[in-house]
């Protein structure tokens, strides 16, 4: 159930993430400046699931890094109404590639995420076990990364992120390396976890079907450099959702056509300009 703003805490009454006039630029190896994104205005409510799509090289990951506090920005980034200074410690970040330590079991890999918080070893193990149960790995806690499938490793990485109970989830194509069937299962798992916790989510993907099936809102970015937001689409599909079922709905296909109409020319422009070779 979404928070009722009339009775919500002061934090819940403010956007979980707010970007106003945000621009991110980098100095390239040859000394020239590269403006990755510009004029970004975006607000994400507590508990809202937002997906971001755009051509390769348009700065989708750069936006996530701005919200995480990993890059310097011009403009304003606010987290629950407060200006972001340094790392965003209210967010958890799930990358495309996991960072599991090969010498630790699944349980130990998840528990280690609590070490910086000074949590006792016993409590960390208990909480790690609970998180692994939530992601469907109750019978795999003692396995090492090389003994796990790609989907299982991704579940461990998700548990690593969730154990700190972040209020915001930043997800950078987290299911990209997985096969189609495993990717669909991970999407359904993520929706189930999100429905229970209702954290704010910003999810970057190249997969338009994935973007629609997961989100409350899909944000479309232009080709880079100096990419900007060109469209936003409210996803009015009923919840709870199962990805394989919702993709059969006529409304799903109507949304797909509408979003692709905004995205297609930008994808073609990116390929024509060579931006497809830049970092996302």
Segments (PLM) and residue ranges:
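Helix-to-loop junction immediately C-terminal to a conserved catalytic motif
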Residues: 68
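Conserved ABC ATPase "signature" region
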Residues: 115, 122-140, 192
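Conserved ABC transporter NBD signature motif
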Residues: 75-86, 127
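The feature captures the beta-strand-to-loop junction immediately N-terminal to the Walker
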Residues: 53-55
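Catalytic Walker B motif of ABC-type/P-loop ATPase nucleotide-binding domains
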Residues: 169-172
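Conserved signature/switch motifs of ABC ATPase nucleotide-binding domains
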Residues: 143-146, 164
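Hydrophobic anchor residue at the start of the ABC signature
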Residues: 158
